[in-house]
């Protein structure tokens, strides 16, 4: 089924830091799912119920009224071990929870990666297909005039976000044909 699915999302935040983390996660997940072409995010102005749903059962009838087929509820809080994310995914029309997740993010620099991972979980749970949002792309960046080309090995997230882009070589040597090793932890390339 390639029809778009309405997704409501509610995030509870404790303070300005967790609000920032929650907003970042929300934006990443919403962008990923919307860009897949299979989802749309229901306009937040239409929400009837918007309090913390992580600890409560949603009023499914309210969400049906605004055409949300699925609901993602999350709570972001700060702990001494990092940023805690609790998430629940609901099937609104069948009035049931279909996924539950709790994890601690030890480093705020991993927020984007966690957003992509949660997107994969939501995508897979709803569509039955493996998500692709936590994908890294390795490539050769080329700059300069044709006769003085500088080639550098680079890596980025699948969405190309500026925060995920990183050069891995300095451009002093030519790089060709980058590939991930089978363990996905190393990159091989010809120099």
Please provide the spans of the model-predicted regions.
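Residue-level detector of Asp-centered blade-edge/turn motifs that repeat once per structural unit
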Residues: 131-133, 182-183
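Short loop/turn segments that connect beta-strands within beta-propeller blades
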Residues: 93, 157-161
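Structural motif
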Residues: 82-84, 146-154
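Single conserved hydrophobic/aromatic residue that forms the stacking wall/gate
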Residues: 1-11
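Residue position within the beta-strands of beta-propeller blades
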Residues: 73, 137-141, 186-190
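Conserved beta-propeller blade repeats
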Residues: 111, 121, 125, 165, ...
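Amphipathic beta-strand/beta-sheet edge segments enriched in Tyr/Trp
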Residues: 54-121
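Short, solvent-exposed, polar/charged sequence segments at loop or secondary-structure edges
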Residues: 16-28, 34-83
């Amino acid at each position: 089924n390639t029809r778009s699915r309405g997704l409501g999302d509610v995030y509870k935040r404790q303070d300005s830091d967790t609000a920032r983390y929650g907003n970042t996660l929300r934006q990443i997940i919403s962008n990923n799912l919307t860009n897949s072409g299979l989802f749309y995010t229901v306009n937040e102005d239409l929400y009837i119920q918007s309090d913390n749903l992580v600890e409560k059962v949603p009023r499914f009838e309210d969400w049906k009224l605004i055409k949300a087929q699925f609901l993602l509820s999350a709570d972001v809080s700060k702990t001494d071990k990092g940023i805690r994310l609790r998430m629940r995914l609901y099937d609104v029309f069948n009035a049931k929870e279909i996924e539950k997740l709790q994890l601690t993010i030890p480093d705020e620099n991993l927020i984007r990666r966690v957003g992509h991972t949660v997107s994969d979980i939501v995508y897979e749970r709803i569509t039955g297909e493996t998500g692709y949002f936590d994908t890294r792309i390795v490539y050769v960046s080329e700059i300069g005039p044709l006769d003085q080309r500088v080639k550098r090995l680079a890596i980025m997230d699948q969405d190309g976000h500026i925060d995920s882009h990183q050069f891995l070589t300095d451009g002093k040597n030519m790089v060709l044909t980058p590939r991930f090793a089978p363990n996905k932890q190393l990159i091989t390339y010809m120099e």
